[in-house]
Amino acid sequence: MRNPALVEEMKTYQGRDEVPHDFDAFWDGEIDKVSVLPDYQLDEHDFHIPNVKCYELTFKGTRDGLVYARIVLPKSEKKVPVIFHFHGYMGRCWDWTDMLAFTVAGYGVVSMDVRGQSGYSQDGLRSPLGNTVKGQIIRGAVEGKEQLFYKDVYLDIYQL
């Protein structure tokens, strides 16, 4: 049963903590830093699947990160809607075959490896190559907002 009073309260709920006073200025500044298209490489892969194009994309992320994504698109002269897939903690992007069902329905799919997780993306100079999946979620909690793990993840997504 729906509680109408609770539904109304949820519409204006702001969380348990106040938004920091410099929140908008911080993110405006971070987005300004990535406003130029990054260096990237887009490689097409021919899996001999009719009506589908498959690509691997790598691009330079923030703080010397290297971001990897797979892209699957229906062969079409028209614009198509695109689904962006981001895996959970300690995951990696979808397999090519997992993405194909969406192209049949007319959608493109972009599946990105989050830096420092189990995929091909790299977290720049802050971590060794390979899987560094534990502890990322709290990185920067002591060092400050410029060092936060998810700050760079969000900026990677913005660039994508």
Question: What do the predicted segments below correspond to?
Answer:
Residues 94-130:
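Short amphipathic alpha-helix adjacent to the substrate-entry channel of hydrolases
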Residues 82-85, 98, 160:
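Short, hydrophobic/aromatic alpha-helical segments in well-folded domains
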Residues 1-52:
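N-terminal targeting or regulatory segments adjacent to alpha/beta-hydrolase or S9 domains
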Residues 128-160:
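Alpha/beta-hydrolase active-site loop
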Residues 61-63, 87-90, 116:
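Short, flexible loop/turn elements at secondary-structure junctions
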